[in-house]
Amino acid sequence: DFSQPEGQELIRRLAIGADVLIENFKVGGLERYGLGYEAMRTLNPRLVYLSISAFGQDGPDAAKPGYDAMIQGMGGLMSLTGAPDGTPGGGPQKVGIAVADLMCGMYAVAGILAALQERERSGLGQYIDLSLLDTQVAWLANQAMNYLVTGQPPTRQGTAHPNIVP
């Protein structure tokens, strides 16, 4: 229980010998207990510290909570998922699994591995700020490319593919 002094001290002791610390709270979740990146970095300069939140650590929505289905909608994925408008069951739908959570975890692994590789060179850890929304939007690169090339916004096409299946 990191809200208690004993729990905070335990986290500090663990951080001294840790390679990576991952937090997945609203902004300031660990910081308010003296367990933020700067505090942990003083204990272990080689620590890679990853913060996952809905909207990132700064910006107008940073303090807001978020969850997978909400991020799928805000990130544009729901606008592409499901049957086309005007067809039975048409309209935006969420993906059947927590795909925004999963893809954020995949980006987290890539970021951590890159930071660990850099640490081998520099001897220093890094801070990684990763948001569910940013990683969700990044997965829409093909739709963005299609829009930039054609000027047509992407639409829901059911199981069809906008570039392969006519």
Show which residues each predicted segment covers.
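Structural scaffold positions in well-ordered secondary structure
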Residues: 22, 40, 49, 68, ...
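Acidic, glycine-rich segments within the central catalytic cores of soluble metabolic enzymes
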Residues: 74-166
